[in-house]
Design a protein with these regions (language model features):
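Bacterial Sec-dependent N-terminal signal peptides
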Residues: 1-42
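Generic low-polarity alpha-helical segments
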Residues: 6, 36, 132, 414-418
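Compositionally biased, low-complexity linear motifs
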Residues: 6, 11, 21, 94, ...
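Intrinsically disordered, low-complexity segments enriched in small/polar residues
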Residues: 12, 31, 46, 75, ...
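Beta-rich carbohydrate-recognition and catalytic domains
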Residues: 36-206, 210-256, 264-315, 339-393, ...
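Beta-rich accessory regions
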Residues: 270, 298-537
């Protein structure tokens, strides 16, 4: 996401002011740490000693990845290699607001315990390092590897601020970097950019994968409010295949951060392959601001087609954006999103760092009402953090029931699975002694779910933050099946086996350690499973 373009769109101004604003941005580039080198260097330590407070500040999540300090947005370059999950991310190491983008880097062997690594990619004379992907070039099609040592190749957008200043329409181009030491250090390709801009203002966020049937690499690229597909035999020379998006899906803003992947499953005596296209768009999300939609269709190596004209969202909550999948993860499809919203991401009241990622999620196909949907649930590795478990059965709720004593105080960090009849409205109130609360509810009359964070704590940093956010209940099952993932400042809800997902962040002064259930009439919790979560830090 180009934040300065976002500001110019969000707050229109005259030409004189626009030129003044652009000049101010360019003058600040050296001050903000813009580097001219084309090779990675070591992380420069930030001023001041942050070690003592790192990962223990107010609002800091306990089991979601967040950077030790400074600004983070989109997950990038997610790839698994030699048993290690690599997470790169849009990063500005000099402030807690958006600035000249770098690729931050973290690694994990289990998807939950993360070690932040030195910055992988710095800005250079071609521009900032915007979003992209990374692949393992197993057969060394790029020629960048060594005998017996295939390269990891990162494909990213170079964003030229000088071109943006001049109001050209070709200041975003696609480039490569490669690693021969399992992702520890990176070298930018000397022939960058490998895909030059044909004259499209928004031309970014390449997501690359190997299409085995066609024996070629496919690049899925966001181009304004469309997706363009390119192919390559070697990751360096690219040919346009087709375009998708006209007259279909949500078009409230620019399309960004796409991903293309498939599922094959048995249907009767035959196997059928479904192709999924993820597209983030900002603004134009289901509840305002940013959001991520998906399309289910067919891909033949040249074009993506879908017969379904319904706009579908991988997450209906306000705080899941720019999510993509890990490459080279075997048969699993593991998703991770940025847990924020461009409406207020730069103003949330954290101090040393800004923004976190969702928990990793397994995505899968799910049938409902005669249609196929993309569903998601927390990856099983997340539950490895459970340190205390509790199981309750047949808990009667007579209009209201407080479960705080049964669940005890575990610092407001737990996973909760609840099943109960879907024949009436019900609200789950996560609260603290000060009366701050985050509410997730089900409206039986409207057949919809909602998150209400109007009294969740700090909401004064953005006029729309303390609102009510809704999502349709897709399932017609007579039993509600709800999974809550609560951390210090976030709530993720996976309803009906992950058919409807909602994510919302909040900023209560104290952890939400208490829980009560409110209903319109007598209601029974058929099953309740509780797991208190340990911190990953």
């Amino acid at each position: 996401m180009n934040f300065f373009v976002y500001l110019l769109k969000a707050y229109p101004m005259g030409n004189q002011m626009r030129h003044l604003f652009a000049s101010w941005v360019i003058l600040l580039v050296p001050v903000l740490g813009f580097s001219q080198s084309t090779a990675s260097t070591a992380v420069k330590p930030a001023a001041g000693d942050v070690a003592a407070q790192a990962y223990h500040e107010p609002y800091r999540p306990a089991f979601h990845f967040s950077p030790k300090e400074k600004w983070m947005n989109d997950p990038n370059g997610m790839v698994r290699y030699d048993g290690v999950y690599h997470l790169f991310f849009q990063y500005y190491p000099n402030d807690i607001v958006w600035g000249p983008m770098h690729w931050g880097h973290a690694t994990s062997k289990d998807l939950v315990h993360w070690q932040q690594q030195p910055i992988a990619l710095y800005p250079d004379n071609l521009g900032y390092i915007f979003s992209g992907s990374a692949v393992l070039d197993t057969t060394n099609t790029s020629g960048l590897g060594q005998p017996g040592n295939p390269p990891l190749v990162a494909i990213f957008t170079h964003h030229d601020p000088e071109g943006e200043k001049r109001h050209t329409n070709d200041y975003q181009n696609q480039s490569l970097a490669y690693s021969l030491d399992k992702g520890a250090t990176w070298t930018k390709y000397s022939g960058n950019p490998v895909l030059k801009n044909p004259g499209i203002t928004d031309f970014r966020d390449p997501n690359v994968s190997w299409f085995a049937k066609g024996k070629k690499w496919i690049m899925t690229l966001a181009t304004k409010d469309r997706i363009s597909f390119y192919s390559s035999p070697d990751l360096k020379s690219w040919t346009k295949e087709s375009e998708f998006g006209e007259g279909i899906g949500a078009h409230g803003g620019v399309w960004e951060c796409p991903d293309l992947f498939s599922f094959t499953r048995k249907e009767g005596d035959k196997e059928k392959t479904y192709w999924i296209l993820l597209v983030s768009n900002n603004p134009g999300g289901p509840n305002g601001g940013s959001g991520t939609q998906y399309f289910i269709g067919d891909w033949d190596g040249h074009t993506f087609k879908t017969q379904d004209k319904t706009t579908r969202w991988i997450d209906y909550g306000p705080d899941d954006y720019a999510g993509v999948l890990w490459n080279n993860a075997g048969r699993r499809r593991i998703f991770l999103g940025w847990m924020s919203n461009w409406d207020y991401a730069t103003t949330v009241p954290t101090s040393t760092w800004r923004n976190a990622m969702t928990v990793p999620r397994n995505v899968f196909l799910q049938d409902a009402n005669g249609k196929v949907y993309l569903a998601s649930k927390p990856s099983p590795e997340v539950l490895s953090l459970a340190r205390r478990k509790l199981r309750l059965r047949h808990v009667d709720v007579d209009s209201s029931a407080d479960l705080s004593n049964q669940l005890k105080d575990d610092g407001g960090k737990y996973i909760l699975d609840i099943k109960g009849a879907a024949d009436q409205s019900v609200a789950f109130v996560f609260y603290n002694a000060a009366g701050e609360r985050m509410v997730f509810g089900y409206n039986n009359v409207k057949q919809e779910y909602y998150i209400d964070r109007s009294a969740s704590g700090r909401t004064d940093f953005h006029p729309g933050f303390g609102g009510i956010y809704t999502a349709p209940r897709i399932s017609k099952d007579p039993v509600l099946n709800l999974e809550f993932v609560l951390d210090r400042s976030s709530l993720e809800v996976f309803a009906d086996g992950g058919l409807t997902v909602m994510t919302g962040v909040f900023f209560s002064q104290q952890p939400l350690t208490k829980l009560k259930v409110n209903t319109t009439d007598r209601w029974t919790i058929k099953e309740l499973d509780y797991a208190a979560m340990a911190s990953i830090w």
